[in-house]
Amino acid sequence: TQEELLQIRKQPELEPERDEASENSRLALEEMGICAVPFYKTVEFSENLAQKECARLEAQLQKAGILDALVVSETDFNCIRKSCPEFLDTVLYAHETGNGTFEGLQVSEELDAALKETVYRILTNLYEAEEGQGISLGADGWFRQGILTGRADKEGEPEFVGALARKRRKELKIRELESKICCAK
């Protein structure tokens, strides 16, 4: 547990668990100079959402396979498709701007212009009601992505969407481990 605590303290942020193939694919993209950012780092929750709504929305994104999917520019998307036969991960990419009016998420201001444009296109393909070709994320926890439909909810706070949420999650994990270590002595 002491070792785990040291490892967590060294990490800038805690990330969702990934399989080895995804980790290797992300390292390969980085080595190729491809900017690939997990979706949860490209967006922030809208200010008008309550904490419970944020947690539910994050749970929907996670269950639908969207939360940790990579966001890339159009150029990098085409490069991955053509030049990375070993790529084994998920990319969230919208070729065209949609007409979705989903207001639960907004583009992070920290992104470069190309990624901002990509995230904007993704967000315009999100809907609150089940309509259109995009992804629906209902306020009641139901979601639809193509033929995949489900419902998600989460107690507590969001853990990944938003820099503050990621910081709080890391601090909480450190406190939990410190408490375990202290109790074990």
Predicted features by range, described:
Residues 1-23:
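Extended, EK/Q-rich alpha-helical coiled-coil segments that serve as long dimerization/scaffolding arms
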